[in-house]
Amino acid sequence: ATCFDPAGLTGWGVRPTIHSRTPVRGAPMTILSRFAAALFVVALPVFLVSANVRFLASDAGYYQHGFREFDSSGRSGLPLADLDRAAQAIIDYFEDDATTLRILVTVDGQEASLYSAKETGHMRDVKSLMRVVYRANEVSLAIVLAYVACVVLWTGERSIAGLARLSLAGVGCGVAVVGIIGVFALTGFDQAWTTFHEIAFRNDLWRLDPETDRLIQMFPEPFWEEATLIVGGLTLVQAVLVVALSVGYLVFTRAGRGEG
């Protein structure tokens, strides 16, 4: 068919072709979206595990329970009141800017340092490790919240159902890692605990003598075995909750579409 072009741009007998298409996201945006999704999948289990470690490390009640459960007073020769006070000092030490942990106790009527130079050196290393855990906890929480707020709620680029699927992937990865660690811990915690120290610390300050070093007298290996099981148990319970909510939402929405 012919048409008249008032602007004289196409001439007689030629109808201008107008292409209509849906905008397609560019490759950079697709890569960014996938990267953000991968960050969310990694950040979710990191947040769960680090939050539970942080919770237990900051719980004076658990320290006090451990002192009584594993006879820390009998091992160290110190009254429970001093041990409980030391527990709070350790919790504060993990949070404050002090370089050296200094706790004074009364021994044979004289004031003395609770820990030796070797023990305070190890606690300095422990504090550095705990700072990494705390920062990982905060950064992973920020990633999870930012992903939900920006990608799901604000831009709508990913649906709630998509978020549920990513959550399942995240907790799946987390449960797999926790499960592997749990198997090693249950089949031989002593070796697993030693391997952890060899990986986490670059020196031998952690090799303490239970006959003379109060740090290991206060916190014997069974204390850490129980703490590891508690962190693993809490993480698994939270993972089950995330799975239940995610699967429940996916099933509910699918059933709703079927009825529609």
Predicted regions mapped to residue ranges:
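Hydrophobic secretory-pathway targeting helix
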Residues: 26-62
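Juxtamembrane interface at the cytosolic side of transmembrane helices
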Residues: 30-31, 141-187, 241-260
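Juxtamembrane non-transmembrane segments of integral membrane proteins
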Residues: 55-93
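Individual transmembrane alpha-helix segments
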Residues: 96-140, 221-235
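Juxtamembrane non-transmembrane "cap" segments at the membrane-aqueous interface
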Residues: 186-211
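Terminal transmembrane helical module of multi-pass membrane proteins
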Residues: 204-258
